[in-house]
Design a protein with these regions (language model features):
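Charge-rich, low-complexity N-terminal segments
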Residues: 1-112
């Protein structure tokens, strides 16, 4: 069974050498995290516990520039960055989808 949450962070970034996105600008990123697991005691995990684990990772980036963490903060690299941190926080297989504005996203699947 799958269980998911959505969180939001506001961050700036610029893509060095890119004509349009080379200037510093910001986005409200939508982060979807969907875990997969077996129900135990009627649920996979309490939503509050899942939200806490995800927020603990996202709080590091909220209202900051992704250029502090990545040389080239494309949405693909941002997705890998956040997904890599979630690997240590979530004992489940999961999918993370990072939306950069409306209609544009990168997705990473992690199997445990």
């Amino acid at each position: 069974m799958k269980l998911g949450i959505t969180e939001y962070i506001d961050c700036a970034h610029h893509l060095p050498g890119h004509t349009k996105c080379g200037q510093l600008h910001g986005h409200t990123y939508t982060i979807d995290v969907v875990i997969e697991g077996e129900k135990k005691g009627g649920m996979i995990v309490d939503f509050a516990d899942l939200k806490t684990a995800v927020k603990n990772v996202l709080n590091e980036y909220d209202h900051r520039s992704f250029n502090e963490f990545l040389d080239y903060p494309s949405v693909e690299n941002i997705c890998e960055l956040i997904g890599g941190k979630l690997i240590t926080q979530l004992p489940y297989s999961f999918t993370i989808r990072v939306w950069e504005g409306h209609g544009k996203y990168a997705e990473l699947n992690v199997t445990k």
